[in-house]
């Protein structure tokens, strides 16, 4: 049921954004329209109106992604972790993940993440994802840390300038570094500080992946 055609209007707006590849900051647009309505005497219902509208649009985005045959777990992984207001950006992440998930790039990325994620789940530690480079004892720790920082710099660029395909392929290529890390580094070191620091490195690793989508929501991770 859609008596006021709100769902249809929202889907129409999102399709226009996607079809025209518009990198719009919808929060600004929504705030501007609310201001115009207030100037005409319409009272703002609550102070959270912008977030409620954005969440409503995000839910409608699920319908569009399903129509594009995006896998359900990819949709959940992206929607649950997305707090921006650029919905073309969200669409790009979904289509790219769907494209690569069963190819070597996707398989490598998921495999690397799963190994780190399962160790963190077993450890059940409260971690920040900020390891101390001073505590690294193995070259493999240093190399993984350096590679993660390189990828994180790419994530920090403006949304419209991000090359998400390149970012996803970078997450896949990090498997070389994680394989060497797991082959040569004992996470549960006898020294508690070193052990915790290695867990922090793995937390940083998972956090980096989750900047793309929440990999923990993908099928076969846990």
Positions of predicted regions on the chain:
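Amphipathic alpha-helical "coupling" segments that flank catalytic cores
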Residues: 1-222
